[in-house]
Amino acid sequence: MKLWLEDDVCRGTFTPRTEHCGWTGVTHGGLLFTALDEVMANWLWLQDLRGFTARAEVRYRQQVPVGTELALEARLVERRRRLIRLQGRAWRAEDRVLVAESDASFMLGS
C-alpha cells in the first residue's frame, strides 16, 4: 500500500493478492475495510495528528477480484475538538468504479 497527502486528501493505491481472499478469487471484505481504515488513519498521521478509530461504518458496493488495483482516498468531513470525522473511498483504479466506502470517527490523543 502506498499513501500520500495531496491537497488535504490522503490518497493511495493497493492491489490485493491471493492471500487476501475471502473466497476463491475475491478479496475479503475485512481487508477492504482495513485498507479504508488505513487511508483514513494516514490522513491524520500525515498531518502530524495522532489518534485511533472510535467508530466506523462500511458499505461494500462491488466485489473486488484479487489482482485489481484500487485507488483509495480519505477526506475530512468534520472536526469537533478531539473528534475527527473522515470519509474513505475505494475505487477500481482502471475505471473509477466505487467498490467500498466508509464513514469513520477518530479520537485524537490528549
Predicted regions mapped to residue ranges:
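Residue-level recognition of well-ordered beta-strand positions that form the cores
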Residues: 13-15, 57-59, 73-75, 89, ...
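Hydrophobic beta-strand-centered segment that forms part of the acyl-chain substrate-binding groove
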Residues: 34, 38-71
